[in-house]
From Swiss-Prot:
Transmembrane regions: none
Disulphide linkage map: none
Any one GO molecular-function label of the UniProt entry: pyruvate synthase activity
Reactions the enzyme catalyzes: 2 oxidized [2Fe-2S]-[ferredoxin] + pyruvate + CoA = 2 reduced [2Fe-2S]-[ferredoxin] + acetyl-CoA + CO2 + H(+)
Top EC class of this enzyme: oxidoreductase
Quaternary organization: Heterotetramer of one alpha, one beta, one delta and one gamma chain.
Alphabetical keyword list: Oxidoreductase
EC number: 1.2.7.1
Protein's UniProt name: Pyruvate synthase subunit PorC
Record keyword Oxidoreductase present: yes
This protein's record includes keyword Oxidoreductase: yes
PANTHER family: PYRUVATE SYNTHASE SUBUNIT PORC (PTHR43366:SF1)
Amino acid sequence: MPVAKKYFEIRWHGRAGQGAKSASQMLAEAALEAGKYVQAFPEYGAERTGAPMRAFNRIGDEYIRVRSAVENPDVVVVIDETLLSPAIVEGLSEDGILLVNTVKDFEFVRKKTGFNGKICVVDATDIALQEIKRGIPNTPMLGALVRVTGIVPLEAIEKRIEKMFGKKFPQEVIDANKRALRRGYEEVKCSE
């Protein structure tokens, strides 16, 4: 008899330089501050900006013993729509969520991946360009993820942005990232 999973798993797909690793780390730190047990780690080969990469999260109420890559995620986050393929949704059950950074509709994503479960889309790149003035869509994607999962409160991510960016960047950069986070949260749309 299979043992019930005691933690929530997320697999991020993006390209190096798009912030998947940073987003998974920020999510983990926010969950840790909320009293959860967490894991966040990237997986990549010889990295160059633009090379495909993955990052992973596990978040739970109990100690997480497993140390392998996420094989059966509850959510797959795709930061770069050019990576969409059936391989992206490998291990994602029909009860899971596929969250994609795209301007395209649910049917486009469904055709590219063959996934018949819940699909959520948000134009995170445009949000990032408008708010942060850089085409790095990880912050709006994190806002969208928080909205569709409720894994941590949005305010917990805002606090992490303040802590992570507070000593390195001026207040206007922090505020721009918080706006991008909120817009991702507000603008994500889901099928079903």
